[in-house]
Amino acid sequence: MLLFSKKIAQHKGGICLEGIVRFGVSMESKLLKQFDELIKKKNYNNRSEAIRDLIRDFIVENQWEAEDVETIGTITYVFNHEVREINDKLTDMQHKHYKNIISTMHVHLDEHNCIEVMIVRGKAKEIVKIADEIISTRGVKHGKLVMTTTGENL
């Protein structure tokens, strides 16, 4: 029996307490043990916080697949600045996509290698296209696109 002094209502799939829905999850005990170990390692206060983050992440990732959703992210790549014309190519790409590139940070890693981190914003399909173009450039040793949400729909 639930005893709350706050407003309680029924919700499809669980009990709703002022905008929060309580529901049950069934899983194997081994999986739950692994989950509990991970949420402790990640410093979550409880399972609910971890599950909310997992659900948000799942929603955000699926929004990218729509391709028309406004998104924000980073393109991080390591490149050898001694590869012929790479600096010019990367700069040209940045100017070509200036409407989507908010900021770029450039760091010298050693005598030969640099890392750049770009903050990008736009439709998911545009961001993926820019990342693919940069990461596939000759001289780029490794690159990664990380997209997230603008937060509007969460």
Curated annotation (Swiss-Prot):
GO BP annotation list: response to nickel cation
Pfam families, per the entry: NikR_C, RHH_1
Record text on cofactor binding: Binds 1 nickel ion per subunit.
Leader peptide range in chain numbering: none
InterPro entries the UniProt entry points to: Acetolactate_synth/TF_NikR_C, ACT-like_dom_sf, Arc_rbn_hlx_hlx, CopG, CopG/NikR_regulator, Ni_resp_reg_NikR, Ribbon_hlx_hlx, TF_NikR_Ni-bd_C
Cofactor(s), by name: Ni(2+)
Binding, Ni(2+): 95, 106, 108, 114
Single Gene Ontology MF annotation: DNA binding
CDD domains: RHH_NikR_HicB-like
Keyword flag Hydrolase: no
Top-level division of the source organism's lineage: Bacteria
Free-text function comment from the UniProt entry: Transcriptional regulator.
Family label: Belongs to the transcriptional regulatory CopG/NikR family.
Protein name: Putative nickel-responsive regulator
Organism of derivation: Caldanaerobacter subterraneus subsp. tengcongensis (strain DSM 15242 / JCM 11007 / NBRC 100824 / MB4)
